[in-house]
């Protein structure tokens, strides 16, 4: 069973619908025992970094997610959920993240002719391969965000060009992140969720 972590900061209905389209048995949960028992986890997210971390803390989920990852559970963060994977974020001051991938979440710099938030379809540029990146180079996906993940190159898999390279996908071990919304990115996005399902299956041999 795949668990979509529920903490009132994510577009969970669309994520669950997309997972169902690729044959994933998934449900929404904030129950620590269900999260720790899951085969794989998805952390969606929309909104502000500090508010989202507060919602996770209020539910006692920060240490639960960290423990699940330490136990080897695959985790996919989507949009704000990807940003929360980092050590810290600079939205409305400096705030601690989940600390699962080294890096800092920063605001996209203002650039002439490029409004913030970065909103709409953008092409992907492969930097290095991961379990989720096959066939993605040059594909177009849907972004909505004002902040980006500043991570060391070793964790950067895919970028998009928005006046500068913007991290689109990152990963460390069994922790993956998509800055864009795979659930809103048509067949390309569904393909990423399908690859995550396959990765979870290979990781657990029982999904």
From Swiss-Prot:
Reaction it catalyzes: 5-[(5-phospho-1-deoxy-D-ribulos-1-ylimino)methylamino]-1-(5-phospho-beta-D-ribosyl)imidazole-4-carboxamide + L-glutamine = D-erythro-1-(imidazol-4-yl)glycerol 3-phosphate + 5-amino-1-(5-phospho-beta-D-ribosyl)imidazole-4-carboxamide + L-glutamate + H(+); L-glutamine + H2O = L-glutamate + NH4(+)
EC number: 4.3.2.10, 3.5.1.2
Sorted UniProt keywords: Amino-acid biosynthesis, Cytoplasm, Glutamine amidotransferase, Histidine biosynthesis, Hydrolase, Lyase
A GO MF term: glutaminase activity
Gene3D superfamilies reported in the protein's UniProt record: 3.40.50.880
Location of the protein in the cell: Cytoplasm
Superkingdom as given in the UniProt entry: Bacteria
Domain Glutamine amidotransferase type-1: residue ranges: 1-206
Known pathway: Amino-acid biosynthesis; L-histidine biosynthesis; L-histidine from 5-phospho-alpha-D-ribose 1-diphosphate: step 5/9
Active site residues of this protein: 79 (nucleophile), 181, 183
An example Gene Ontology biological process: L-histidine biosynthetic process
Entry-linked InterPro entries: Class_I_gatase-like, GATASE, Imidazole-glycPsynth_HisH
Subunit field text: Heterodimer of HisH and HisF.
Function field: IGPS catalyzes the conversion of PRFAR and glutamine to IGP, AICAR and glutamate. The HisH subunit catalyzes the hydrolysis of glutamine to glutamate and ammonia as part of the synthesis of IGP and AICAR. The resulting ammonia molecule is channeled to the active site of HisF.
Protein name: Imidazole glycerol phosphate synthase subunit HisH
Naturally occurring in which organism (per UniProt): Streptococcus gordonii (strain Challis / ATCC 35105 / BCRC 15272 / CH1 / DL1 / V288)
Lineage, highest ranks first: Bacteria, Bacillati, Bacillota, Bacilli, Lactobacillales
